[in-house]
Amino acid sequence: MTCKNTRRLYQIITTFLRYGIDEIIPDIPLTRHARLGRKALFWVRNQHKDQPFGVRLRLALQELGPVWIKLGQMLSTRRDLFEPELAEQLALLQDSVEPFDGKSARQIIEQALGGSLETWFDEFDEQALASASIAQVHTAKFNQNQPLAGKDVVLKVIRPDIEPIIKADIALMYRLASWIPRLSNDAKRLRATEVVREYEKTLLDELDLTREMANAIRLRNNFENSEMLYVPEMYQDFCHKNVIVMERIYGIPVSDVETLKANGTDMKLLAERGVQVFFTQVFRDSFFHADMHAGNIFVNPNHPENPQYIGIDCGIVGTLNQNDKRYLAESFVAFFNRDYRRVALMHVESGWTPPDTDIDAFEQAFREVCEPIFAKPLSEISFGHVLLNLFNVAREFNMEVQPQLVLLQKTLLYIEGLGRQVYPQLDLWQTAKPFLQNWLNEQVGVKAILRDLKQRAPQFREHFAEFPEAVFNALQQQKQINFRLDELNKTLQAQGRQKSHNVRSIVSGVIILGVLWRFDDLPLWLSCGTLVTVLLVLLLQRKS
């Protein structure tokens, strides 16, 4: 470890000590050296004994700076790992820091674009419009030499020298994380190294603004001409790893409820559209904005009777596959139907809990945790907390962590919070139910069968010529086996007809399995056709 890293580690440790965070260190042999180290730093006292632990942890992270603030924000979404009071305190962390010098921002932009700012822009404001731990934004407008002359823009700039700071602090986090699981079984459950690895990926992705650009373009295309959501345009010719240029938007912050009401906004429709936007992203697009907190969501002040959201900052997004979406849709529908066995089976069928899981015990665990939720009216039930309860139960049955679902659950909590802030009477279930049912119908209904056949048509054409021969071979094999069965029957007659029937049934079952295995590479309906043919032959032979 370098001298610089050692100094930083000392700073981190003493900061935690001044806020009494060391009280969580258990008195066990493994922590003996840590406790001795605490005594060695006897002059560093807990200066905030009158504050609850959650408040002290939040203040400590705030003092340690941007990297630790963002870690706390991420941990606040992991309500499957922490007590609600602690998670709520971490959620109060604000990613707002002093801006760096505007002249430095100008220099970074000019270096990225390869020329003076005045070549492309007028009215560049060196005073940052907003500043966060990773980047800050400045305003300008395209000059008369540009096709979009006079268009207002925002330039986002990565902080200088932030990457080495992040990497140094992440390295220290890994050291601390490797020690945590040895403290206790509860500490193992935190999976601290996985949390740090997930956080590292998120941070490093945010350092590459071309990712944000690509995400914004994809989201904008998904909602092109939509009345529900508008995503500002990215000007790709001006976008680089550390600088992006985008359309400037003018909207009302979604958290400014009084201004929205004064503008005549239809608050009920606005709240419902927030839920609709989220579920459209999840079930239609399999791609969702995963950082939809109040600072990134605005409302178009025009046509307030038909309110439209404006979404910015697409640095963090989530993606889902068919298995993820099926899990979500079926789990929610089964939950609201109070079909806890189906919820349990969904976790096993998804492959996220071991195949030998005791389904009866799993079902009962879901029932005990979820049934009390129905003491509330359906309109007051939180989807985010339902998902959290499902995760908590599943973890007790060794469910593997699904980062994409954790990200989705965090986003769902944001959406619910904003929706009920805008319109407290929002009925999430009634708003989301059509999306869930329509998606399930499309996956298992007639449309799904026709779509599957259409997708498999090339395979069918390729294997069609093999079908008659395959059926003929299967029937020939059946004849040979029947001959041997008859021989076997003669020797078993003394033991009664029932045993003979059982043998025939067992062997027939083996044949059927063999046919299924033999044609597993054929289209679904072609394999089924072969199986039905063999079954008919068996039935006719049995009657004869």
Curated annotation (Swiss-Prot):
Q: Set out the biological process GO terms recorded for this chain's protein.
A: regulation of ubiquinone biosynthetic process; ubiquinone biosynthetic process
Which residues are connected by disulfide bridges in this protein?
none
Q: What does this protein do?
A: Is probably a protein kinase regulator of UbiI activity which is involved in aerobic coenzyme Q (ubiquinone) biosynthesis.
Asked if Cell inner membrane is a keyword of the record, the answer is yes
Enzyme Commission number(s) of this protein: 2.7.-.-
Q: Name one GO cellular component term.
A: plasma membrane
The record's keywords, sorted A to Z, are: ATP-binding, Cell inner membrane, Cell membrane, Kinase, Membrane, Nucleotide-binding, Transferase, Transmembrane, Transmembrane helix, Ubiquinone biosynthesis
- Record's bilayer topology term: Single-pass membrane protein
Main location per the UniProt record: membrane
| GO molecular function per UniProt | ATP binding; protein kinase activity
Query: This chain belongs to which protein, by name?
Result: Probable protein kinase UbiB
Q: In which pathway does it act?
A: Cofactor biosynthesis; ubiquinone biosynthesis [regulation]
- The residue ranges of the Protein kinase domain are 123-505
Location(s) in or outside the cell: Cell inner membrane
> Family per UniProt?
Belongs to the ABC1 family. UbiB subfamily.
Report the transmembrane regions from the record.
522-540
Write down the top EC class of this protein: transferase
Give the annotated active site.
D291 (proton acceptor)
Provide the binding site for ATP.
L129, A130, S131, A132, S133, I134, A135, Q136, V137, K156
This protein's gene is called ubiB
- InterPro entries documented for this protein: ABC1_dom, Kinase-like_dom_sf, UbiB, UbiB_bact, UbiB_kinase
